[in-house]
Regions:
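Beta-propeller domain segments
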Residues: 1-126, 132-138, 164-170
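Short alpha-helical basic/polar micro-motif
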Residues: 72, 141, 159
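C-terminal structured "cap/appendage" subdomains that terminate the fold
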Residues: 129-149, 153
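Blade-level signature of beta-propeller repeat domains, shared across WD40, Kelch, NHL, RCC1
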Residues: 144-170
Length: 170
């Protein structure tokens, strides 16, 4: 996209569903709220009332993720194996929660981009590392496009590197 992007593991101890982790493009000199605010002008209750002059300057991230999913690495898909609409999209590893009553994450998500911009949505792409009973057997860490266009995902839960290939029509 020509822009700098990042994924952020937001703060803990505000509950199961706060604060959302996120993926966003980075604006030079931009203020994303830390440590006083999150997701726009929402005060962290531990800093309530501090720095009111910054409240309206907080940039809202492009894509909000489930809280505590621990987005660790992302790549922009530059292969040709997957359907054409995946070209340039973000694939991000979600390592998984450690401090929620119900686990979340443990997957790879796809963030569709249009003209280098995110719409705010993401899609589950590679799942199954978390069983319906809540047992974890894998934790995605790294994600990269292989020379053949497949997606490689490292997993420190099982000690594996997974290759995701597309075999359908393009």
């Amino acid at each position: 996209t020509g822009a700098l992007w990042c994924s952020v593991n937001e703060r803990d101890w505000l509950g199961d569903n706060l604060v959302p982790d996120y993926i966003t493009h980075v604006t030079e000199g931009g203020f994303y709220g830390w440590p006083w605010f999150y997701t726009g002008g929402h005060w962290d209750p531990r800093h309530q009332g501090k720095h009111p002059e910054l409240k309206n300057k907080v940039i809202v991230p492009d894509v909000l993720l489930q809280a505590h999913t621990a987005s660790l690495q992302m790549t922009f898909y530059d292969g040709s194996q997957f359907p054409a609409e995946y070209k340039g999209d973000i694939f991000a590893s979600q390592h998984g929660s450690w401090n929620r009553s119900v686990r979340s994450g443990y997957e790879v998500v796809r963030v569709p981009l249009k003209n280098g911009k995110a719409s705010g949505i993401y899609q589950d792409f590679l799942t199954g590392f978390l069983t319906p009973a809540g047992d974890v057997w894998g934790r995605p860490v790294g994600v990269a496009t292989a020379p053949d266009g497949s997606l490689l995902v490292s997993d420190d839960g099982s000690g594996s590197v997974w290759r995701v290939s597309y075999t359908g029509s393009r």
